[in-house]
Amino acid sequence: MKFGYCTSFDNYPLLDQLGYDYIELAGREVVGLEKSKLNEMEKTLKTGRVKCCGFNSAVPGEIAIVGENYSEETAREYAKKLCAVGGQLGISGIGIGSPASRRLPYGYNVPLADSQAEEFLSIFGEESAPYGIKIFWEHLNPTEGNYGLTWNHGVELVKKVNMENVMMVCDLYHMEVNREFLLDLDQEPSLIGHVHMAQLEGTERRGILPNYRARYEEFIEKLKSLGYDGIISIEAFSGSVDEEAAGSIRLLRELCGMQKA
C-alpha cells in the first residue's frame, strides 16, 4: 500500500522527508488559488517524488450537496472548476465529505436528499471523467452532520449513481465514531476507492496512535482480505503536523510490514 497525508502544500517538504508517497490537499482551498501558485505547485508535483493523490475537504459550505439550497447549476459550475484544477495537479481522486454542505433542516424530505446527492455525485462523475479522476463519497458521523452517516447508506447511494468512476472513501475514523462493524465493508468491497485513517483522542482528531494498534491491524487486514491495495491517507485535524505525520507513517509502515530498518 501507499501512504498519504492530508495537509496544506506548505508541508510538502515535510512529507517528502518523512517518506510519504502522497499529499492530499483541501480542494476548497486549492480551487481558489491564483494561476501562478497553481503553476508552481504543478511544477513541484511533476518533478518531486511526492505526488498529489487528490482532494479532501473538497466542497465549501456555500455549495450545497443536499438540502434547500441545492442547485444543479451551481454544483456543475463548481465541479467543472474543481476538476480542472485537479487535472492540472495530476490528482486521481476527489473525496466528497464536506459536512457543512450536507446538513438538512429538521423534517427535510430524505428521499429528496438522496436524489439530490445522487445528482451531485453524477455531476462530479461526469465532469471528472475527462481528467481520469475518480469521485469518492465519504460517509460521516453524527458529530459532523445529519445526512449520509453510515457506510451502508453510502454504498447504496453510489450503487444508484452507477458510474465506474464514482466510489467510496473508507474512513476508519467515522466507522469508529459510528460504532460500525468492519463486516459492513463486505457489502460491495469493489467500491472502496480510497482510505482515510485518524484517531479520536478525547475531543481531538489525531493521526493514528500506538495505543490503538490492535484495531488498526484488524482494519488493514480486513482491507487486504477484500483486495484493497491502494492509498491510505491520514486525515488529522489536531496536533502539530510534523509530530502527527511522523508518528503516523512510522506506525503505518509497521502495520503494513514495511518498517524501515
Model regions and ranges:
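Active-site-proximal loop/turn and secondary-structure-junction residues that shape catalytic pockets
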Residues: 9-11, 27-29, 58-61, 100-102, ...
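Short hydrophobic interaction/assembly module
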Residues: 45-72
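Catalytic-core regions built around general acid/base machinery
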Residues: 37-49, 119-128, 184, 218-222
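N-terminal substrate-binding region of glycoside hydrolase catalytic domains
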Residues: 14-35, 56-64
